[in-house]
């Protein structure tokens, strides 16, 4: 009987994910959800004071109404001020919930936590690289996640395609990124967190499955920002064909 259970467990890990650690992560995600919801409410009020009256809608993009492009500079300034304040409070608090990441391509919607400590952070969900930035600061934000254990949020990271959108919902704003390319790098290659001169999102996970020898990395560029209380998203990246995957 024990042998059968072991085979079943191994099969679940190979074809799905580790069920034991996934239960733990599901519990942590549930516990963090109400805490994060309260944080969103608090920052919504702060953002309303920051941005003032909502912008009028003008035109559509991808089915979503967007505000005039001329407003992007002021929205980015507001986002930066809010992000700086948020970072000053949350940076370095290992395991604390920061926001949510949504990737429709792989059916992902999960809470992101601070830092990439194995037990203190990544056991709860994807974690923000502490040496990286925060969305809205105009630099590179990195998020790492497991592929086989602890709910395996990035198990299907290699299914994400160039041109896909990645939405990061922070208490101070919603940031939509457009995927530019992907790379497979050595596990110790930190060039993925280089400065690029624009607001970039980097996702990484161990590669191949069941190995930590390399990392599969997704690079995406900020496309639009929606501050809490604002009526619409504001496009900050001119429409152009996505960069061919490398």
What role is predicted for each listed range?
Residues 3-246:
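Solvent-exposed, non-transmembrane regions of membrane-associated and secreted proteins
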